[in-house]
Amino acid sequence: MIYFHDIDPIALSLGPIKVHWYGIMYLLGFTAAWLLGRKRIADGRLPGVDANGFSDLLFYAMLGVVLGGRIGYMLFYALGDFLHNPLLLFKVWDGGMSFHGGLLGVIAACWWWSRKHKLHFFDTMDFMAPLVPLGLGFGRIGNFIGAELWGKYTDGSWGVVFPSGLPAPLNQLDHATLQAQFATGALNQFARHPSQLYEALLEGLVMFVVLWAVSAKPRHRYLVGGLFALMYGLFRFAVEFVRMPDNGVYVAFDWLTRGQILSLPLIAFGLVLLVMSRRAPVLQPQLPVAAEGKA
């Protein structure tokens, strides 16, 4: 059954303060990462690091997500606007975050933290990888609620009519008028793939289940990080075929998107890590010892 998107992106208004669902999804993602990370620390999945050390790591990773995500968006998707007005970088309330930029931010944070605590960088990355997918899933749900990053037209019964995705002059009509037209079936031809939910399922739920299961037992170094990079790259590349290209423009061949181009290095990197893991040592869980100074 085709759905008419009429969800208010603002979850709560407190006078001049507006709490957006997208922000709540970020909070849920960070909360999930904190809870899951503490469980993995208690199970000895990052030897020598206790709960305090993990909280320190997560703090820097969160900074990497936000700063890297915003900077990445401006560089990858809005470079012209950024060069014209660099202050746009700080207008986070206008939206605009890049997963690939956020990933680079997390990598930088984990590299710095690992070096500070004299831990193998990829042990840290393997530890963090299973904590990320649920946050990705929540973020894509936030995209859906905010009616952004929608897909291409579909005649499937699961399509969604996004008012902001309607062509002119329909996108100028008031909400009540659009609902009345939708009730007659007049807008069904403009139903789109809910690509945000596809990504929430694949990059969120499926990746979490796989990575959590693999990381819950002894495994070779590089394996979990390699699976993360490979799976995200493949899932993102695939969903981009039914998702509208950024700014409505293809990069090449009238089908290749910027998101697909940015995903290709991830796929290659994931494959390299999986090959490296075959000769890497097997990591065994070790319960944290606060006295070791990794706090």
From Swiss-Prot:
- The protein's superkingdom reads Bacteria
Q: Mark the transmembrane ranges.
A: 17-37, 57-77, 92-112, 127-147, 196-216, 222-242, 255-275
Is Signal among the key words of this record? no
Q: Which Pfam families match?
A: LGT
Question: By its UniProt entry, which InterPro entries does this protein fall under?
Answer: Lgt
Give the main EC class: transferase
Q: Which UniProt keywords apply?
A: Cell inner membrane, Cell membrane, Membrane, Transferase, Transmembrane, Transmembrane helix
Q: Name the principal localization, coarsely classed.
A: membrane
Keyword Zinc-finger belongs to the record = no
Instruction: Show the GO MF annotations.
Output: phosphatidylglycerol-prolipoprotein diacylglyceryl transferase activity
This chain's function reads: Catalyzes the transfer of the diacylglyceryl group from phosphatidylglycerol to the sulfhydryl group of the N-terminal cysteine of a prolipoprotein, the first step in the formation of mature lipoproteins.
Q: What protein family is recorded?
A: Belongs to the Lgt family.
Which named protein is this? Phosphatidylglycerol--prolipoprotein diacylglyceryl transferase
- Per the UniProt entry, what species is this protein from, by scientific name? Stenotrophomonas maltophilia (strain R551-3)
